[in-house]
Regions:
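Non-catalytic cap/lid and distal C-terminal segments of serine-dependent acyl enzymes
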Residues: 1-191
């Protein structure tokens, strides 16, 4: 509102599964942050997709990484040459997956309270959600595939991107977060 730049960096904020695009507005001062930093903040609703082109559902990865950036650039003075992406829990998975899968698109990626979900065992009540997004209820079978964040880090081509992973011992995904943190430390992202 108070910034008069010709274009603005874009921060994509992704909510956890079960929250919609209003979660950041309801629980944080995200509008004040955007104004203070002079950035555009986009908060898409990813439903229960984990930011993926769902096996049984919509193409959220395509929407997040291609269609929405084009739309944002059409309607706002967005600098798509400087994009950042961050998310919480399942949104954190989506943020890292997008950043690692589309080299050069993001300058920074951050995940809060989420690791590489391919190392987790999930409650059976999540079976339908997982099957719709990933095509399986046992995500451990996806280790070594393009759905495995550890594999994406090990094979990443864009090491100029800043990568951040934050988690605590109280997080639901602490086990896979620790494994992902170890993978990041062993990669060229940590140098």
């Amino acid at each position: 509102e108070n910034n008069e730049k010709s274009s603005y960096p874009v921060l994509w904020l992704l909510p956890p599964a079960g929250c919609d695009h209003t979660a950041w507005q309801r629980h944080t001062a995200v509008e004040d942050l955007a104004d203070e930093l002079g950035i555009i903040i986009v908060m898409p609703d990813l439903k229960l997709s984990y930011g993926l082109d769902m096996i049984h559902g919509f193409t959220y990865f395509q929407m997040l990484t291609k269609e929405l950036p084009e739309m944002v650039a059409d309607y706002f003075p967005a600098d798509l040459g400087f994009q950042m992406i961050a998310g919480v829990k399942e949104g954190g998975y989506a943020a890292l997956n997008a950043a690692l899968s589309v080299p050069g698109q993001y300058h920074m990626a951050a995940s809060y309270s989420c690791g590489s979900l391919t190392d987790e065992t999930f409650d059976p009540e999540m079976d339908k959600q997982l099957d719709n997004a990933f095509g399986t209820t046992d995500l451990r079978t996806l280790n070594g595939t393009d759905k495995d964040l550890k594999m994406l880090i090990q094979t990443a081509k864009d090491h100029n991107m800043a990568l951040s992973l934050e988690y605590s011992e109280k997080d639901d995904y602490k086990a896979s977060s620790a494994l992902l943190a170890d993978c990041i430390l062993k990669s060229s992202f940590s140098s």
